[in-house]
């Protein structure tokens, strides 16, 4: 919205700053951060009052989690609210990729909100049926995948960019849209599975989003894309404003989610943020890089898949408990130890993901 202040500029005054994506990205970060600090405590008080017993805790989970009884959920409302407010304030409203990412974020956030509401209302961990959530997720992802494809340059449509390899695009043809659908749905559910410890999911999401934001800015500029020898996708630079807002809102939420958490993000936050990562990846055509920078989420999801399939086949378990962060809890690792080590892994993966821009 503030971008339109450039109309008041004569080319050399303060209003001219709003032309620059980097300036507006900084503004988006600070706006979302302040939003989180200002509205965080009041929101937690409202959630605690409305929810009473808070988020239901699984009886078969680690014993240490019983101490979390009474902690309110739906804290993702704070992140999504900060993200929406800040992005609308600082991003260009005529950019299709901004609206695409916001659409996916808000839509998956609504699915998560319905699930959280059902859990709190019924005081059980079931929530909305998994099949219903998956179906709705696929519907949203179909719209998003087609939306992204229509706004990509003709020479990039249905093309899958291969990281590291120079000028290598794999033409998936009619399989590209289904592939993008799986990326979005997979990312949303992988982040959802990761959100099981205080502070565990939000920092890796912020790291992945920050990395993808840098990539979006690079591929959205002709000069940067030529220098780095990556494909040019006009308009994706504005996504940096969204990811900056996500980073700021995430920090504001982490202030209250740090151990011991005063609030959980719930499915409201995890599905929204995971969907956002998937939407950014398909917008920038860096779907495979998402698997690198979001490698932690991939491992968490795979641990559940492996556990379920192996148990059905043999009646035994590979892990003490899945997702894998619970496996380490069962082994006696302290919750903060798991969280910080997973953060470190996320940072390493982000560096590897960024390196793919130059290693060609």
Swiss-Prot record:
Transmembrane segments: 27-47, 69-89, 93-113, 134-154, 168-188, 199-219, 239-259, 262-282, 288-308, 337-357
Entry's localization field: Cell inner membrane
Pathway: Cell wall biogenesis; peptidoglycan biosynthesis
Catalytic activity: UDP-N-acetyl-alpha-D-muramoyl-L-alanyl-gamma-D-glutamyl-meso-2,6-diaminopimeloyl-D-alanyl-D-alanine + di-trans,octa-cis-undecaprenyl phosphate = di-trans,octa-cis-undecaprenyl diphospho-N-acetyl-alpha-D-muramoyl-L-alanyl-D-glutamyl-meso-2,6-diaminopimeloyl-D-alanyl-D-alanine + UMP
EC number: 2.7.8.13
Gene: mraY
Cofactors: Mg(2+)
Membrane topology: Multi-pass membrane protein
Name this polypeptide is given: Phospho-N-acetylmuramoyl-pentapeptide-transferase
Classification via HAMAP family: MraY (MF_00038)
Entry-linked NCBIfam families: mraY
């Amino acid at each position: 919205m503030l971008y339109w202040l450039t109309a008041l500029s004569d080319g050399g005054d303060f209003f001219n700053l709003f032309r620059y994506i980097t300036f507006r990205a900084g503004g988006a970060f600070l706006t979302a951060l302040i939003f989180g600090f200002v509205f965080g405590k009041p929101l937690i008080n409202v959630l605690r009052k409305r929810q009473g017993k808070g988020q239901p805790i699984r009886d078969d989970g680690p014993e240490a989690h019983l101490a979390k009884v009474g902690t309110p959920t739906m804290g993702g409302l704070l992140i999504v609210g900060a993200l929406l407010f800040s992005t609308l304030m600082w991003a260009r409203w005529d950019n299709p990729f901004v609206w695409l990412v916001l659409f996916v974020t808000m839509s998956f956030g609504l699915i998560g909100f319905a699930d959280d509401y059902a859990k709190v209302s019924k005081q059980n961990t079931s929530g909305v049926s998994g099949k219903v959530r998956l179906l709705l997720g696929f519907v949203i992802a179909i719209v998003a995948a087609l939306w992204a494809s229509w706004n990509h340059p003709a020479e990039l449509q249905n093309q899958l960019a291969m990281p590291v390899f120079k000028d290598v695009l794999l033409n998936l043809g009619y399989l590209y849209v289904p592939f993008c659908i799986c990326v979005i749905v997979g990312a949303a559910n992988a982040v959802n599975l990761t959100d099981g410890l205080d502070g565990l999911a939000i920092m890796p999401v912020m790291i992945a989003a920050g990395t993808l934001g840098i990539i979006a800015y690079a591929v959205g500029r002709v000069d940067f894309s030529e220098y780095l020898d990556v494909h040019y996708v006009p308009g994706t630079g504005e996504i940096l404003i969204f990811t900056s807002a996500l980073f700021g809102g995430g920090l504001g939420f982490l202030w209250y989610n740090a151990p011991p958490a005063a609030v959980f993000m719930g499915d409201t936050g995890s599905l929204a943020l995971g969907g956002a990562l998937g939407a950014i990846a398909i917008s920038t055509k860096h779907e495979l890089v998402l698997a690198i920078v979001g490698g932690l989420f991939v491992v968490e999801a795979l641990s559940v898949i492996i556990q379920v399939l192996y148990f059905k086949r043999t009646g035994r378990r590979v892990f003490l408990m899945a997702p894998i962060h619970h496996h380490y809890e069962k082994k006696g690792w302290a919750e903060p130890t798991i969280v910080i080590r997973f953060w470190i892994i996320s940072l390493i993966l982000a560096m590897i993901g960024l390196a793919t821009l130059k290693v060609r």
